[in-house]
């Protein structure tokens, strides 16, 4: 599929003492929801911090919205205001009240919609519309409610790109489902002009809202593509124990018990299993991601 890129990267490299992120080529499609998937320490947050300008001491370059460079992101407020970001660290000062958090954003962002912010705080069950609640401090909120408060902030602005680092992690199952609805509504509101990038290891919970997946292990992209294309590239194989060893050499991932075996196979290699008593299924993104990660990690 041909597509425009909302963010592209070239020769990206960031070194730590015991970790190296190395991505020669990065293309994130415009108008879609892209998931950065990987285990803890794979490099997802490092990549996001580089994208949004939190980390500047790296090699390589980014291009935003097809025309703006890293330097323009830093020096041109109009470019930065097109991007909404939430991270895993402190977004609001702990001593701020909820009312102060609203007031600060009204000062910082010309396009901040205070009424929309209040509506989202209520809709996301962060606060009740009382004076007591408005004077509650950020430090008094649960991790989940702090995340929801960050989401309310970025969704109250007129952005073209949301970059969300692990937004689902502190949320309960119902709120993760709500987050998926919010992302879909955000994308649908601008007919292909808005994009979302988020990192996750809650693959199953976020699959419904993932259009494009980038799987990262040890600081490198090990698989990527539109989810529907990945589901055509791979296929789930199931069979009886008697055929397990014969099938194993073809399978991308493999697990077995007393009753049979299951694994993921590249669809192009399915013919190599001819003659075995097997059944096939379309894989979920979660099955694909776990299999790919297992093939690129010590946790097998």
Tell me what each language-model feature is.
Residues 1-25, 30-32, 73-75:
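A short, flexible loop at the N-terminus of ABC-type nucleotide-binding domains that lies
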Residues 162-166:
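Catalytic Walker B motif of ABC-type/P-loop ATPase nucleotide-binding domains
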Residues 37-39:
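The feature captures the beta-strand-to-loop junction immediately N-terminal to the Walker
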Residues 180, 252-300:
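C-terminal coupling/interaction segments
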Residues 87-149:
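ABC-family P-loop ATPase nucleotide-binding domains
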Residues 52:
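Helix-to-loop junction immediately C-terminal to a conserved catalytic motif
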Residues 60-79:
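Conserved ABC transporter NBD signature motif
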């Amino acid at each position: 599929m041909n597509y425009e890129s909302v963010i592209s990267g070239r020769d990206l490299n960031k070194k730590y003492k015991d970790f190296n992120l190395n991505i020669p080529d990065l293309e994130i499609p415009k108008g879609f929801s892209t998931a950065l998937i990987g285990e803890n320490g794979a490099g997802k947050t490092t990549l996001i911090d580089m994208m949004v300008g939190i980390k500047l001491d790296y090699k390589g370059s980014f291009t935003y919205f097809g025309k703006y460079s890293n330097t323009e992101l830093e020096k041109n407020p109009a470019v930065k205001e097109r991007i909404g970001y939430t991270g895993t660290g402190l977004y609001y000062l702990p001593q701020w009240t909820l009312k102060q958090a609203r007031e600060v954003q009204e000062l910082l962002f010309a396009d901040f919609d205070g009424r929309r912010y209040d509506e989202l705080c209520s809709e996301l069950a962060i606060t009740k519309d009382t004076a007591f609640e408005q004077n509650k401090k950020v430090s008094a909120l649960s991790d989940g409610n702090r995340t929801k408060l960050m989401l309310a902030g970025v969704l109250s602005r007129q952005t073209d790109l949301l970059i969300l680092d692990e937004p689902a992690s502190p949320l309960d199952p119902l709120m993760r489902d709500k987050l998926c609805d919010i992302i879909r509504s955000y994308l649908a509101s601008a007919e292909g002009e808005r994009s979302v990038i988020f990192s996750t290891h809650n693959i199953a919970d976020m699959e419904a809202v993932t259009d494009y997946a980038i799987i990262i292990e040890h600081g490198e992209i090990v698989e990527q593509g539109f989810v529907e294309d990945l589901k055509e590239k791979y296929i789930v194989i199931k069979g009886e124990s008697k055929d397990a060893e014969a099938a194993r050499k073809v399978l991308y991932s493999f697990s077995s018990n007393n009753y049979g075996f299951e694994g993921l196979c590249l669809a192009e290699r399915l013919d190599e299993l001819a003659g075995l008593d097997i059944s096939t299924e379309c894989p979920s993104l979660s099955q694909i991601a776990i299999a790919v990660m297992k093939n690129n990690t010590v946790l097998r």
